[in-house]
From Swiss-Prot:
The keyword Secreted does not apply. Pfam families: LrgA (PF03788). It is found in: Cell membrane. It comes from the Bacteria. The chain crosses the membrane at residues 6-26, 30-50, 61-81, 97-117. GO terms for cellular component: plasma membrane. PANTHER family: ANTIHOLIN-LIKE PROTEIN LRGA, HOLIN-LIKE PROTEIN CIDA-RELATED. This is Antiholin-like protein LrgA. GO terms for biological process: cytolysis; killing of cells of another organism; programmed cell death. Keywords: Cell membrane, Cytolysis, Membrane, Transmembrane, Transmembrane helix. The gene is lrgA.
Length: 143
């Protein structure tokens, strides 16, 4: 029988609200503009990794919010539509920034992936070489 504890909607909402309150306070005191939602995600991720908050404590509300995420983006979409006049004036600049940022993002992601994969391949090769050397020593052969 499962002993998984079910947390109430209210307790989960309190956890999310407390994290958002703290992230709003942090965002107002930072010297650079940073969205409080990003700070909140970092705080939530950190608390989950450090096991201060258990996944069960926020899982069902998180799943519910993920289910309605499209609805949550409606206000952002409306504000973009309201800004089409401004965006039309700077279309070339906006398009240039989007294309350049996308290329930089792809390049950095690719280089980082190659670095990580190359590091793993080198560790595998080093491990294989070490096994061959150790195997030779067992049989009285020195490499």
């Amino acid at each position: 029988m499962s002993t998984k504890k079910v947390y109430s909607f209210l307790s989960q909402a309190f956890i999310f609200s407390a994290i958002m309150l703290v992230s709003n306070i942090i965002a107002t005191h930072l010297p650079i503009p940073m969205p409080s939602s990003v700070i909140g995600l970092v705080i939530l991720f950190s608390l989950l990794c450090l096991k201060v908050i258990k996944l069960e404590q926020v899982e069902s509300l998180g799943t519910a919010l993920t289910g309605i995420i499209g609805f949550l983006f409606v206000p952002s979409g409306i504000s973009v539509i309201n800004s089409l006049g401004v965006m039309g004036q700077y279309f070339v600049q906006i398009l240039t920034v989007i294309v350049v940022a996308t290329i930089i993002l792809l390049a950095v992601t690719g280089l980082f992936a190659q670095f990580i994969l190359g590091k793993d391949d080198k560790e595998i090769e080093d491990t294989k070489e070490l096994k061959v050397v150790n195997k030779g020593r067992k049989h009285g052969k020195v490499a």
